[in-house]
Amino acid sequence: MNPVAFEIFGLEIRWYGILICMGIILAYGLAYKRSKIYNIDFDKLTDVFIVALPFSILCARLYYVIFNWSYYGANPSHILYIREGGLAIHGGLIGAVISGYLMSRYRKLNFLDLIDTVAPCFILAQAIGRWGNFFNSEAHGGIVSYEFISHFPKFIQNGMYIDGFYYHPTFLYESIWNIVVLIILLLITRKHLAKGSIFYLYLIFYSLGRFFIEGLRTDSLMLGSLRMAQVISLVFIILGIILIIKSNIKNKSTFKQ
């Protein structure tokens, strides 16, 4: 699979970057529509977006570099080679929440309304961005037989044929799962849920899928013998459950009063 889409004056434009940009643009468009549901000033939301986007990318890269320090410590000049891949979703999500919280305070936005607004936008961008891994021939699973991979479209078969072997298209599994989560979040948006519930459900549903899919991958970021994505996913699942229970208990108490 050729990771380069085209060249402009000798500069390679890679599919990875194109798909990341596409995900960001579509997520921004969805945020515009959802800002009306939550009565959020879109100019203020754009201010949050302008700050959170670069900070999230920085955190996504930093997270990836830290857990691949054996390589980047020996090749520090490669730390900036983002267009070749190497953005960790969990790092980006953590960066987005931190910067989003700080900006919500600065622009006087309700933080829970903000994260409920953007939760489906996150998962939409993730679903699209995963295809960048496909073109980079990364984030795939272990070796599978031709009988297994033959159930997939031909272009997936070709893309997952690497160095003489076929591999699990884990990027595809996660992209499909993310689309399912997106549909769920959009369907429950207008339900009478406590503030923050959409985001908490995003944490739970996304992390459930990521936990199981990560177990198939061969290039997981590791901390000793632990797959970091699975550890963080478990933390997010537990945190999401606690927060959604707490917020709905608080919501019922407020309603009774």
From Swiss-Prot:
Subcellular location: Cell membrane
UniProt name for this protein: Phosphatidylglycerol--prolipoprotein diacylglyceryl transferase
Role: Catalyzes the transfer of the diacylglyceryl group from phosphatidylglycerol to the sulfhydryl group of the N-terminal cysteine of a prolipoprotein, the first step in the formation of mature lipoproteins.
Membrane topology field: Multi-pass membrane protein
Transmembrane segments: 8-28, 48-68, 84-104, 109-129, 169-189, 196-216, 225-245
InterPro entries named in the record: Lgt (IPR001640)
Recorded metabolic or biological pathway in which this protein acts: Protein modification; lipoprotein biosynthesis (diacylglyceryl transfer)
Assigned EC number: 2.5.1.145
Superkingdom of the organism of origin: Bacteria
GO CC terms of this entry: plasma membrane
GO biological process: lipoprotein biosynthetic process
Keywords: Cell membrane, Membrane, Transferase, Transmembrane, Transmembrane helix
Source species: Clostridium novyi (strain NT)
MF (Gene Ontology): phosphatidylglycerol-prolipoprotein diacylglyceryl transferase activity
Pfam families: LGT (PF01790)
Protein family per UniProt: Belongs to the Lgt family.
Residues holding a 1,2-diacyl-sn-glycero-3-phospho-(1'-sn-glycerol): 130
